[in-house]
Regions:
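Active-site entrance/lid segments in N-terminal catalytic domains of soluble metabolic enzymes
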Residues: 1-100, 205
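Conserved acidic functional residues
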Residues: 50, 105-106
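Conserved active-site-proximal phosphate/metal-binding subdomains
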Residues: 81-102, 108-253
Length: 253
């Protein structure tokens, strides 16, 4: 379960809801307060932190996180400026086996998994690819939009939240590119996009949205996604492809 920990007002109740409903892992995209870590650990819930910079990973480990997700700028959603290929090994080096490091950002198949393992990560975290599955929860048109996008159809915009966020380019992102001086800090801009009817984050398939303005996070790997695949089949194919890549690489010695 992922929450915006930079919006702390509802955090205790939200974390308690995760615990009460059997959540086993809490993932934070914008930092993890120490009291949240302690509450999760007291209830046998693992805590992971999305980290876009080396110093973020250092802070996450110091706060007691069980897992660090090294997320490159290619990722959909809130993201930084350092690419996955450069970020992952630097975070692996600084974490020094204190906790597992997982790679994220622009990864969509077994080749990405094999590459992440070669960089020292112990696994991968894929977001966009798993939105394009029948099981994923999302607003109408979101999955279809992902299937139609090319690798350069995303943009890093502050228009939806006030923070840098990689999303599907549309009329709303274009407006804020042209009116950047009017963007408010988080969470005011987040609230504004909701009030504008452009942000239905977390809403389901029965929600009415305007596809030309809607908040649809997407990573740069989106251009490789051309069909909806059941999540279980997708996991199996990713692992099989990674194994094939690793086997092929072993013949190059």
């Amino acid at each position: 379960v992922d929450l915006l920990t930079a919006a702390p007002g509802d955090m205790p109740a939200q974390v308690q809801a995760i615990i009460d409903n059997g959540g086993r892992v809490f993932v934070a995209g914008l930092g993890v307060p120490r009291d949240v870590v302690n509450l999760c650990h007291d209830n046998n819930v693992l805590v992971a932190s999305m980290c876009g910079k080396v110093r973020h990973a250092v802070a996450a480990v110091a706060a007691g996180c069980d897992l660090v997700i090294a997320q490159g700028t290619e990722a959909g959603g809130h993201t930084g400026t350092v690419a996955t290929m450069a970020l992952v090994p630097q975070i692996v080096d600084v974490v020094e086996n204190k906790v597992p490091v997982v790679a994220a950002g622009g990864l969509f198949d077994g080749r990405g998994l094999a590459a992440a393992l070669s960089l020292g990560a112990e696994g991968v975290w894929m977001g966009t690819r798993f939105i394009a599955t029948p099981e994923a929860w999302g607003t109408p048109g979101y999955k279809e939009k992902l299937l139609s996008m090319a690798e350069d159809d995303t943009v890093v915009s502050k228009g939806f939240t006030g923070k840098t966020c990689r999303v599907a380019r549309n009329d709303y992102t274009q407006y804020w590119e042209e009116h950047a001086s009017e963007i408010e800090p988080f969470p005011a801009q987040f609230i504004r996009s909701i009030n504008d009817g452009a942000n239905h984050l977390g809403a389901g398939p029965n929600t009415e949205v305007d596809p030309s303005r809607e908040f649809w996070p997407a990573g740069q790997g989106v251009g490789a996604i051309n069909e909806l695949v059941p999540a279980g089949d997708l996991v199996r194919s990713i692992v099989a492809e990674a194994e094939a890549v690793i086997d092929r690489m072993s013949t190059l010695r």
